[in-house]
């Protein structure tokens, strides 16, 4: 406490200092310290890295157990960041390719589905944030304690496979953008290397604080928004058709594949793990019910705004290609590789050629998604395996997992657009297969009182979440079946696929069967004190 004899200058200095200092140690903080010493686990963010949420209501609000402060724009700003990083997965090159194909083949008719798919994605991501805030641990850490060793190693492997598949798409998307912006001078493999090095450069900013890294993402999202909004303005889409597409549900038999792609891109397995870790970048005491409730409120607002922005960006891309290519002979052949060429032929040059505007937006999408992919890889590997490594070491390991196969892919498929399209389909299938292994553990944990305490979801929300999860899994299952029927040839290959399917379904049944069981002893022991404290 400041001395009464101090002048106004000293009070101002203390206020400035208070805005940067950590919250005072309380009994719960000491309890957390003891817990971390006992467990010595890998954590998403060290205490010194976390952003302090400074109270503006007065000292009484800090100690009050059930006092939830009124809404504050300043606090909303302090909580802003994780939701926008999470929203990058809704804007990666794979999603942009789904947008342009939906627009070219289905016109404006699937915009309503894009809207509701984004809403479904928002619900899943809010549950992910809820787990991270209420428990003080992220999803991969909780899975490590919830499941037996063999099951968690399978979950870790599946999460890594999904991440590598997404990363290959994202890095190649950046490489395509670099190829466009260099007028074809740089080949795909060179773009892959540039993207990899840029990713490490951006991650270096994390050493200067989480806020700096979040600022970089804000610039990249703004770049995407401006680029694709500019393209939409150049295309001059029909406002009437746009509104009809958003408000009136329509689904034709010829657009089912595109509809499946729109919904299937909503849930990215690595993003479910990522968001539960990102919310821990703010200093929140999970043992104080009011603090957790306040954080959940602000994170819900921030995530909603972030995904509204992502919806608008996806809307811009879809409408540009709906206006320019719907009903044309080129519609069925447009992909991420040749989209720039088709845009240039359709809309021409001008003061700012649309080809380069598309390249800038695609580059921002690719760069931002590769950074979040590396970020997610650190949390997934550290959480499942409990690796206490330096962040640069973890980044190097997780980056190598994706960059090496991506360079091989870029060299092999450098000159073949058709081969890249087939590869992209296989990667979509690969990621679709991993969705249950992120959704089922999330919904299992978020509904358990032993894990969540008073913040477990209620029966209505639980049924809604499971309905969405089953819907997404079935839709992606349709994509898998359709793909395998058309692509899988030969008896031996069919036998291998069939055997793998049996093992795949068996593991999903095992995960679902765990929904009603109690968590492991280690997790129960750690969380029993939190439940008691939250109930006070």
From Swiss-Prot:
Family matches, as InterPro entries: NRAMP_fam
Molecular function terms, GO-annotated: cadmium ion transmembrane transporter activity; manganese ion transmembrane transporter activity
Keywords, sorted A to Z: Glycoprotein, Ion transport, Membrane, Transmembrane, Transmembrane helix, Transport
Region Disordered, annotated ranges: 1-37
Parts of the chain that traverse the membrane: 76-96, 104-124, 161-181, 185-205, 213-233, 259-279, 305-325, 347-367, 400-420, 435-455, 465-485, 492-512
Residues the record marks as carrying a glycan: 38
Pfam families per the UniProt record, alphabetical: Nramp (PF01566)
Principal localisation: membrane
HAMAP family: NRAMP
Record function comment: Probable divalent metal transporter.
NCBIfam families: nramp, Nramp_1
PANTHER family, per database record: METAL TRANSPORTER NRAMP2, SOLUTE CARRIER PROTEIN FAMILY 11 MEMBER
Protein name per the record: Metal transporter Nramp2
Provenance organism: Populus trichocarpa (Western balsam poplar)
Gene: NRAMP2
């Amino acid at each position: 406490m400041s001395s009464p004899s101090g002048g106004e200058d000293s009070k101002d200095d203390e206020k400035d200092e208070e805005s940067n200092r950590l919250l005072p140690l309380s009994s719960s903080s000491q309890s957390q310290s003891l817990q971390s010493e006992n467990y010595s686990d890998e954590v998403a963010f060290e205490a010194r890295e976390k952003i302090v949420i400074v109270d503006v209501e007065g000292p009484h609000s800090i100690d009050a157990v059930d006092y939830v402060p009124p809404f504050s724009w300043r606090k909303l700003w302090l909580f802003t960041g994780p939701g926008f990083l999470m929203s990058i997965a809704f804007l990666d090159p794979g999603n942009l390719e789904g947008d342009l194909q939906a627009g070219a083949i289905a016109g404006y008719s699937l915009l309503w589905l894009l809207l509701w798919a984004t809403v479904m994605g928002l619900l899943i991501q809010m549950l992910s944030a809820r787990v991270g805030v209420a428990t003080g641990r992220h999803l991969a850490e909780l899975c490590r304690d919830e499941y037996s060793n063999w099951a968690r190693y399978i979950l870790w492997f599946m999460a890594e496979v999904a991440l590598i598949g997404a990363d290959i798409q994202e890095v190649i998307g950046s490489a395509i953008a670099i190829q466009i912006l260099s007028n074809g001078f740089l080949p795909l493999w060179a773009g892959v290397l540039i993207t990899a090095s840029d990713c490490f450069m951006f991650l270096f900013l994390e050493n200067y604080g989480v806020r700096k890294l979040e600022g970089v993402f804000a610039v990249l999202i703004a770049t995407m928004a401006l680029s694709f909004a500019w393209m939409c303005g150049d295309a001059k889409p029909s406002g009437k058709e746009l509104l009809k597409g958003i408000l009136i549900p329509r689904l034709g038999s010829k657009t089912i594949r595109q509809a499946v792609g729109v919904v299937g891109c909503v849930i990215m397995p690595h993003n479910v793990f990522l968001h539960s870790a990102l919310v821990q970048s703010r200093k929140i005491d999970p043992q104080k019910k009011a603090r957790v409730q306040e954080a959940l409120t602000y994170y819900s607002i921030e995530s909603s705004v972030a995904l509204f922005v992502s919806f608008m960006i996806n809307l811009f891309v879809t409408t540009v290609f709906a206006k320019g290519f719907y009903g044309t002979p080129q519609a069925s052949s447009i992909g991420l590789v040749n989209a720039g060429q088709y845009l240039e032929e359709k809309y021409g040059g001008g003061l700012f050629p649309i080809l380069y505007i598309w390249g800038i937006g695609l580059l921002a999408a690719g760069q931002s998604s590769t950074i979040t992919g590396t970020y997610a890889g650190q949390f997934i590997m550290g959480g499942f395996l409990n690796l206490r490594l330096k962040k640069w070491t973890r980044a190097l390991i997780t980056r190598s997992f994706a960059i090496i196969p991506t360079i091989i892919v870029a060299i092999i498929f450098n000159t073949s657009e058709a081969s890249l399209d087939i590869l992209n389909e296989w990667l979509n299938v690969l990621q679709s297969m991993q969705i249950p292994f992120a959704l089922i553990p999330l919904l299992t944990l978020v509904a358990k009182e032993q894990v969540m305490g008073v913040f477990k979801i209620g029966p209505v929300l639980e049924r809604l979440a499971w309905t969405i999860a089953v819907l997404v899994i079935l839709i992606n299952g349709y994509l898998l079946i359709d793909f395998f029927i058309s692509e899988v040839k030969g008896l031996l290959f069919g036998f291998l696929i069939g055997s793998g399917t049996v093992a795949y379904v068996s593991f999903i049944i095992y995960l679902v069967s765990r929904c009603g069981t109690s968590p492991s002893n280690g997790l129960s022991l750690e969380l029993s004190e939190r439940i008691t404290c939250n109930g006070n």
